[in-house]
């Protein structure tokens, strides 16, 4: 059932939208560690309890997080995983990749509310980082792409 949902959702994302997402993601990956670190700092600002899901980073200030090796390593892992998902947006393998992420998140008690917050913060971070390149087409493309990812994660959520 989850695979069917994902495959149907793939059809909703046009080739042009996939190109926009991939192009802007490649722009962001020039500074991947700082982009993803700032993304998590934004998440922790909205939901300080979310920071406690990372015991090695619990209680750190934003400036401490920016220089933390643990945060930098996590940022690299997240950027690599996101890069993989973005490259596989039109692939039937995407649901399997996301199933692994959903299982990991379930173990760490990360669920639908966290996915919603991530979506909100991702859009804010994209706008801040891309500036004028974050136009309506870019916004719509990212929103649709993340909704595909989120739909699969929710289906796979324990």
From Swiss-Prot:
Q: Which residues carry this modification: N-acetylglycine?
A: 2
Please give the family membership noted in the entry. Belongs to the globin family.
Subunit notes for this chain? In the oxy-form exist as a dimer, it disassociates into monomer in the inactive Met-form. Upon deoxygenation it aggregates into tetramer and higher oligomers.
Instruction: Spell out the PROSITE patterns in the cross-references.
Output: GLOBIN
Is Lyase one of the keywords UniProt gives this record?
no
Keyword Transcription among record annotations: no
Question: Any idea what this protein is called?
Answer: Globin-1
What are the UniProt keywords, alphabetically?
Acetylation, Heme, Iron, Metal-binding, Oxygen transport, Transport
Globin domain: residues covered: 12-158
- Please give the superkingdom of this protein's source: Eukaryota
| Record GO terms (molecular function) | heme binding; metal ion binding; oxygen binding; oxygen carrier activity
Alphabetical list of Gene3D superfamilies matching this protein: Globins
- What does the entry list as the binding residues for heme b? 74, 105
